[in-house]
UniProtKB/Swiss-Prot annotation:
This is Protein FAM50 homolog. The lineage of its organism: Eukaryota, Metazoa, Ecdysozoa, Nematoda, Chromadorea. Pfam families: XAP5. Transmembrane segments: none annotated. Residues 97-109 have a biased composition (Basic and acidic residues). Residues 76-112 are annotated as: Disordered. It comes from Caenorhabditis briggsae. Signal peptide: none annotated. One of its GO terms (cellular component) is nucleus. Belongs to the FAM50 family. It comes from the Eukaryota. GO terms for biological process: chromatin organization. Coiled coil: none annotated.
Length: 326
């Protein structure tokens, strides 16, 4: 705290003490006025009563009849009422003065309380007398400091809008790609291969592909006439693919099977992304469509013995037993 602030506080404290003394003097004066009013009223009524008694006694000297006594008392009472009526105006003015004094006392007390609780008004009054406050110098900022880690609303809003634009662009691109047609090579497997081709969209599911395969094969294979997609299995690269996957899921992620990519439809596809003895071979293996009942009967026999359910998080590759079959 500076010396100017200390002097200012001392000045304000002295001023409050003076105001407090003035208020106490006013309160004492009001109390004295109240006491005087009470004494004046009491003495006035007592004096009037004693004066009336003395007047009656002086006028009833000696023996007086009852009627005369009553008339004298009646006259004295009427005289007293007249005096009281004359003094009513003075008592009314006195009560009015007392009420005004009470209101003034309340106003002074209220004003004093406000002055005690608030320093703002007093500070404004003392602005001219107080010494000027010297503002502190602000340290300059270094423009070479990296502030990218600090929060920036404008930058965050820009990044948020950019992410939304990229996400919308990606969704539009995915929807466009899902509507593209591809040719899928498949073979109905009942112990021997019956290869065919069909055109589907990248966004079609494996279940939709199986339904179309049933329509194409049921004329040739009678066991498929009453068949549904749930009765069939879709096997690709020795992996049993669940029916809810789409072709787009495997194309985008470039999922690999045991013997190569699950689905590659590029003109120059990198069919093998592994360095092993089976790199060079012809076209990709066609998908196998198999009855579940046939698989349950023959799953211990090659090639069904090598099939296993597809797990997205698992990395597939050829092991020693697979290479020995080549």
């Amino acid at each position: 705290m500076s010396r100017a602030d200390e002097g200012r506080l001392i000045h304000l404290a002295k001023k409050r003490e003076r105001e407090k003394e003035d208020i106490e003097k006013q309160l004492r004066k009001l109390e004295e006025d109240k006491e005087k009013c009470k004494v004046g009223i009491t003495s006035k009524f007592t004096a009037n009563y004693e004066t009336m008694e003395e007047s009656v006694k002086s006028k009833t000297y000696g023996l007086v009849s009852l009627d005369d006594m009553k008339n004298i008392q009646k006259n004295e009472i009427s005289n007293r009422d007249l005096q009281v009526a004359r003094g009513a105006s003075s008592s009314t003015s006195l009560a009015k003065d007392s009420q005004e004094a009470r209101e003034k006392e309340e106003h002074v007390a209220k004003h004093t309380q406000k002055r005690v609780l608030s320093f703002a008004y007093e500070d404004e009054e003392e602005d001219e007398d107080a010494a000027p406050i010297v503002p502190k110098k602000r340290v300059g900022m270094d423009p070479t400091v990296d502030t990218s880690f600090l929060p920036d609303k404008e930058r965050e809003e820009f990044l948020r809008k950019k992410k939304e634009e990229l996400a919308a662009e990606w969704r539009v691109k995915q929807n466009t790609e899902k509507n593209e047609e591809i040719t899928v090579a498949y073979a109905y497997w009942d112990g021997s291969s019956h290869r065919k081709n069909m055109k589907v969209k990248k966004g079609n599911t494996i279940s939709q592909c199986l339904a179309r395969a049933i329509e194409a094969l049921k004329k040739e294979f009678t066991e498929l006439k009453a068949c549904t997609p749930e009765n069939l299995m879709f096997v690709k690269e020795d992996l049993i693919i669940p029916h809810f996957y789409t072709f787009q899921d495997f194309i985008v992620t470039k999922a690999m099977g045991k013997t190569g990519p699950l689905f590659v439809f590029d003109s120059a596809s990198d069919v093998r992304i592994r360095q092993d003895a089976a790199l060079d071979y012809g076209e990709s293996h066609p998908a196998k469509i198999v009855l579940r009942s046939w698989y349950e009967k023959n799953k211990h026999i090659y090639p069904a013995s090598r099939w296993e359910p597809f797990v997205p998080s698992k990395k597939y590759g050829r092991n020693f037993d697979d290479l020995s079959d080549l």
